[in-house]
């Protein structure tokens, strides 16, 4: 299988092949992308999912641009981070407008608010579906990185010192390491 990097670049989504020496990026042929913030991929069905802050929606399409659908448009203000649970077939997202973390089935049904208290500016979200955890950043007045079980229970703070605007997360499942990018300190840790 081809290794690719998916990129949400405001008004378009791109895929960059990591199998070619020049890392050429290809713009995905999907209409009406106004302000894409985050993107994730479901390796089971082959859909990409993204948040669009301008149209206040969560959408999906196949990598070739076909099958584009809008999944969530109600009670959504500033959808930000997005993460696919490829095991249980769920979709998680953060909303910096409603200050919530929510989940729905991958087809947009069975929506549920998981966390709505003590969130200031929730941004990035990543999952470890095998172990049953979610991790997210909050870059509000007291910036922090937190985790909880995928059902929102057993919430705890992992990092709350030396952070400015933690807004990117990556999880290395093999090495069990969490990496974050900070837009204020310009660091990746």
Label every model-predicted segment:
Residues 1-28, 48:
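An edge-strand/N-cap motif at the start of beta-rich repeat modules
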Residues 2-3, 44-46, 87-89, 130-132, ...:
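Short coil/turn segments that connect the beta-strands within blades of beta-propeller domains
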Residues 7, 49-50, 92-93, 135-137, ...:
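Residue position within the beta-strands of beta-propeller blades
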Residues 8-10, 44, 53, 96, ...:
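Short loop/turn segments immediately following the C-termini of beta-strands
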Residues 18-21, 62-66, 105-109, 149-153:
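Short loop/turn segments that connect beta-strands within beta-propeller blades
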Residues 27-32, 71-75, 114-119, 158-163:
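Surface loop/turn motifs at the tips and blade-to-blade linkers of beta-strand repeat domains
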Residues 35, 54, 78, 97, ...:
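Beta-rich catalytic cores
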Residues 39-41, 82-84, 125, 169-171:
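Hydrophobic core register within WD40 beta-propeller blades
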């Amino acid at each position: 299988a081809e290794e690719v990097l998916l990129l949400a670049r405001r008004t378009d989504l791109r895929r960059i092949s990591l199998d070619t020496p020049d890392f050429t990026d290809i713009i995905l042929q999907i209409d009406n992308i106004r302000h894409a913030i985050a993107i994730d991929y479901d390796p089971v069905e082959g859909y990409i999912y993204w948040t669009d802050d301008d149209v206040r929606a969560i959408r999906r399409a196949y990598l070739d641009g076909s099958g584009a659908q809008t999944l969530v448009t109600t009670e959504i203000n500033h959808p930000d981070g997005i993460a696919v649970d490829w095991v249980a077939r769920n979709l998680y997202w953060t909303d910096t407008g409603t200050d919530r973390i929510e989940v729905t089935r991958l087809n947009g049904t069975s929506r549920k608010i998981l966390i709505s208290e003590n969130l200031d500016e929730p941004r990035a979200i990543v999952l470890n579906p095998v172990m049953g955890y979610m991790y997210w950043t909050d870059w509000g007045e007291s910036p922090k990185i937190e985790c909880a079980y995928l059902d929102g229970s057993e919430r705890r703070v992992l990092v709350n010192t030396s952070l400015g605007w933690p807004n990117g997360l990556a999880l290395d499942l093999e090495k069990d390491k969490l990496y974050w990018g900070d837009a204020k300190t310009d660091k990746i840790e």
